[in-house]
Amino acid sequence: GKPDGAFXDNITVVESVXFXI
C-alpha cells in the first residue's frame, strides 16, 4: 500500500498490512 498505488490508487487494508503502511 503506497500513496502512488502499489495495486491501486489508494491504500487498502491488505496493502497496509503487507507494506506496512
UniProtKB/Swiss-Prot annotation:
Question: Record's superkingdom?
Answer: Eukaryota
Q: In which tissues is it expressed?
A: Hemolymph.
Q: What is its main location?
A: secreted
Q: Per the record's keyword annotation, is Secreted included, yes or no?
A: yes
Sorted keywords for this record are: Lectin, Secreted
Location in the cell reads:
Secreted
> Does the keyword section mention Secreted?
yes
Any one GO cellular component localisation term in the record: extracellular region
State one molecular function term (GO): carbohydrate binding
The induction annotation reads:
By infection.
> What function does the entry list?
Binds and precipitates antigens of the parasite Echinostoma paraensei.
Protein name as it appears in the record: Hemolymph 65 kDa lectin BG04
> Which organism was this protein described from?
Biomphalaria glabrata (Bloodfluke planorb)
Name of the gene encoding the protein in the UniProt record = BG04
